C-alpha cells in the first residue's frame, strides 16, 4: 500500500483539501479512494480589534502556508516523496462575514468575521424588505450596515466576498463562490437545479431580491459586487503560477491543478456527514453549534430563527445557527481536570487525561441517579451574544433554586442541556413547519465521547442522531471530496456520496428516549422563562464585557479545535 500511495503522490493522482476554521487551518490529502493519507494543520486565533472580531490577511497567508507545509512534511515523512501537483484542489472556510475590496484588489477595512453581531439595524431592514430572514452575520447585512453607518470605504467598494472566495481568488485569479458559501452572503434563487449527466447545472443569487436590496442599500449595481456562483462539480479555474507560489513559496508546487468551487464550512460539514439529500441533516457542535436540514419543500414563511442556505449542489437547507456551543462544557472539564490533576499530585495517584475527564463527567449526565430535567439546575452557555434568543450581550450562568438537586450528574446534564437548548428552540420552528427529518448526523469534538452526548442530543431535537466514521475527518476532507467530484458529475452529488464515498451505514444511531425527551422539554421550559436574566447579568457586568468569547476560552480545548474545521 505504501509503494502504491507513493506512486500516486508522484503521479499527481491525489486530491488536496484545505479548510480555514475559526481556530485551526487544516490541509488533508486523499487518495483515489478518498481515504486520507496525509494531513497538516496550523492553529490560529481571531483578534478583537476596535470592537470587531477579525483575522488579518497576513495571518491567512501565514496560516495557509504553514498548514500546507505541514502536510508536505507529513507526506515526506510517510512516503519519502514530495508532492508537486494534484488531481484536484478544494478550499473552504468559515462562512459569512465581510471582505470588501477596491478596484485594485486592496482590502478596504479589516475582515469582519461571522462572529460580529453589530449589524442589527441592517439585518432587520433587509429581512423586512425581502421577506426573507437575513441573519446578522450575512455579508449583505455587513455591507448595508456599513452604508447605514456612513463608513467612508463604501464609496470605494468594487467587490465583496467571503474568506473561501478570497483564498480561491489568490490561487486561481477567479472571483467565484460555491453556491453553499454564496448562500451565506445573499439569498439564492429557489427551485430545482437544472442539471444532467456531466452537467452540474447552475444557480445564482435571487434576482428579484437583488433588485429590492439594491434600491434599499442605494448602490448602483449590487450584483456586480458579488462573486459568480457555481454549483458542486462546476469548473472553477486552475492553480496559477502566482497561486502556487503564494501557497508554497518553496517553488515545489506546480501550477495547473483544477479547483472546485470554494465552499463554506457548512457545506463541507454536509458532505462529511453524507447529509445533502432531502430529509437528512447534520449537527455540528464546537465553540458554536448549528443544525442543517435539507428541505423537500420551501418554508411557508420567513423565520428569524432559521437561515435558509443551500447544499453545495444548490438544494435549499434550513439552518439553525447558535453562536454558543460546547465551550462551557469544555470549561467545566478543565476545572474537573485540574481537580483530578491536583488530587493526583497530592496522593501520588496516576493522573488522567482530558478524554477520561470527559468520559467520566458525561457518564454522570446519564447515570441512574441523575434527573432527566437536571434536577432544577439551569445553565446558559452564552459566552457571546445569541441572536436566536435575542440576547445581544451574553453571560455564561449557572442557576439553581434552593430546592434543586445539586449533584455532579445534574450539573453535567444541565450543561449539556444548556448547550443544546438554543438549538432546540430553533428546531422547534422546523417542527412547526412540518419539516420531515429521517435522521441527523452529529459531528464535533464532543462526540469523541460515545454515548451520552448523542443520546441527549436525540432527546433535545426529537430525531434519531447518527454518528459516521467520516464525520470526524472534518471540512478539509469534505472539500477534498468536492474536489474529487469534479470527475464524477455523471452522478448527482447525493448519489455520489451515498454510493461511492460512503456506501456503509452509520456507526451507531441513537433514538430519542421518552424519559429523556420529557426531561429536556421540562428543562427547556425553565430555560425560556429564565432568559430575561441574561439582560440583567449583562447590565451588571458590562464595563468588562466583550461581544464574543475570549481567546483563552475559544481555543483552549483541542476537542473543540478538532470540530472547528467544520464550524
Outline where the language-model segments fall.
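Conserved phosphate-binding catalytic cores of ATP/NTP-utilizing and phosphoryl-transfer enzymes
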Residues: 2-11, 77-80, 142-149, 241-251, ...
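Acidic, glycine-rich loop-and-beta core segments that form the ion-binding/anion-interacting portion
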Residues: 262-302, 306-310
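Short acidic, glycine/serine/threonine-rich loops at helix termini
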Residues: 99-103, 171-175, 181-182, 189-192, ...
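Phosphate/pyrophosphate-binding loops at sites that engage ATP/ADP/AMP, CoA/4′-phosphopantetheine
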Residues: 66-86, 150-154, 211-222, 247-250, ...
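N-terminal phosphate-binding loop and adjacent alpha-helix
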Residues: 40-81, 131
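Active-site nucleophile and cofactor-binding loops and adjacent substrate-binding regions
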Residues: 34, 55, 59, 87-94, ...
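Gly/Ser/Thr-rich active-site cleft segment
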Residues: 20-22, 133-263, 412, 416-417
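Glycine/Thr-rich phosphate-binding loops that ligate phosphate moieties of nucleotide
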Residues: 1-41, 48, 84-124, 233, ...
Amino acid at each position: 500500500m505504501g509503494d502504491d500511495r507513493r506512486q500516486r503522490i508522484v503521479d499527481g493522482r491525489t486530491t488536496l483539501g484545505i479548510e480555514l476554521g475559526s481556530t485551526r487551518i487544516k490541509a488533508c490529502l486523499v487518495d483515489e479512494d478518498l481515504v486520507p493519507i496525509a494531513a497538516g494543520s496550523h492553529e490560529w486565533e481571531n483578534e478583537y480589534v476596535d470592537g470587531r472580531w477579525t483575522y488579518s490577511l497576513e495571518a491567512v497567508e501565514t496560516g495557509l502556508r504553514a498548514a500546507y507545509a505541514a502536510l508536505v512534511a507529513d507526506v515526506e515523512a510517510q512516503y519519502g516523496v514530495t508532492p508537486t501537483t494534484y488531481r484536484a484542489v478544494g478550499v473552504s472556510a468559515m462562512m459569512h462575514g465581510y471582505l470588501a475590496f477596491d478596484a485594485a484588489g486592496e482590502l478596504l477595512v479589516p475582515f469582519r468575521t461571522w462572529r460580529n453581531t453589530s449589524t442589527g439595524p441592517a439585518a432587520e431592514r433587509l429581512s423586512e424588505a425581502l421577506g426573507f430572514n437575513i441573519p446578522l452575520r450575512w455579508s449583505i447585512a455587513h455591507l448595508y450596515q456599513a452604508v447605514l453607518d456612513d463608513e467612508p470605504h463604501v464609496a470605494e467598494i468594487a467587490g465583496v466576498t467571503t474568506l473561501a472566495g478570497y483564498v480561491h481568488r489568490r490561487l486561481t485569479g477567479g472571483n467565484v463562490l460555491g453556491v453553499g458559501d454564496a448562500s451565506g452572503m445573499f439569498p439564492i434563487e429557489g427551485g430545482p437545479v437544472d442539471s444532467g449527466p456531466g452537467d452540474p447545472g447552475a444557480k445564482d443569487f435571487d434576482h428579484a431580491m437583488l433588485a429590492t436590496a439594491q434600491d434599499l442599500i442605494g448602490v448602483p449595481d449590487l450584483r456586480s459586487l458579488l462573486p459568480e456562483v457555481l454549483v458542486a462539480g462546476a469548473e472553477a479555474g486552475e492553480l496559477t503560477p502566482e497561486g502556487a507560489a503564494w501557497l508554497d513559496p518553496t517553488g515545489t508546487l506546480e501550477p495547473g491543478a483544477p479547483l472546485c468551487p470554494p465552499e463554506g464550512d457548512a457545506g463541507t460539514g454536509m458532505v462529511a456527514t453524507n447529509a445533502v439529500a432531502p430529509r437528512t441533516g447534520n449537527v455540528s457542535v464546537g465553540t458554536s453549534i448549528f443544525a442543517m436540514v435539507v428541505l423537500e419543500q420551501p418554508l411557508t414563511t420567513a423565520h428569524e430563527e432559521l437561515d435558509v442556505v443551500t447544499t453545495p449542489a444548490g438544494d435549499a437547507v434550513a439552518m439553525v445557527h447558535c453562536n454558543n456551543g460546547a465551550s462551557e462544557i469544555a470549561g467545566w472539564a478543565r476545572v474537573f481536570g485540574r481537580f483530578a490533576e491536583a488530587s493526583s499530585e497530592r496522593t501520588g495517584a496516576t493522573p488522567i487525561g482530558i478524554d477520561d475527564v470527559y468520559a467520566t463527567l458525561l457518564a454522570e449526565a446519564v447515570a441512574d441517579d441523575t434527573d432527566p430535567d437536571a434536577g432544577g439546575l439551569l445553565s446558559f452557555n452564552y459566552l457571546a451574544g445569541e441572536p436566536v434568543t435575542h440576547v445581544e450581550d451574553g453571560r455564561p450562568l449557572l442557576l439553581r433554586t434552593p430546592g434543586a438537586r445539586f449533584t455532579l450528574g445534574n450539573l453535567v446534564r444541565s450543561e449539556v442541556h444548556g448547550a443544546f437548548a438554543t438549538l432546540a428552540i430553533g428546531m422547534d420552528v422546523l417542527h412547526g413547519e412540518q419539516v420531515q427529518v429521517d435522521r441527523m448526523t452529529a459531528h464535533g469534538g464532543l462526540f469523541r465521547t460515545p454515548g451520552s452526548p448523542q443520546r441527549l442530543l436525540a432527546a433535545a431535537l426529537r430525531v434519531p442522531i447518527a454518528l459516521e466514521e467520516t464525520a470526524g475527518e472534518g471540512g478539509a476532507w469534505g472539500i477534498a471530496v468536492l474536489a474529487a467530484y469534479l470527475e464524477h458529475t455523471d452522478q448527482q452529488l447525493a448519489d455520489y456520496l451515498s454510493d461511492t464515498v460512503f456506501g456503509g451505514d452509520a456507526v451507531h444511531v441513537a433514538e430519542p428516549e421518552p424519559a429523556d425527551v420529557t426531561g429536556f422539554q421540562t428543562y427547556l421550559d425553565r430555560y425560556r422563562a429564565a432568559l430575561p436574566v441574561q439582560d440583567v447579568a449583562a447590565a451588571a457586568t458590562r464595563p468588562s464585557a466583550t461581544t464574543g468569547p475570549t481567546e483563552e476560552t475559544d481555543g483552549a480545548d483541542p476537542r473543540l479545535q478538532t470540530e472547528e474545521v467544520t464550524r
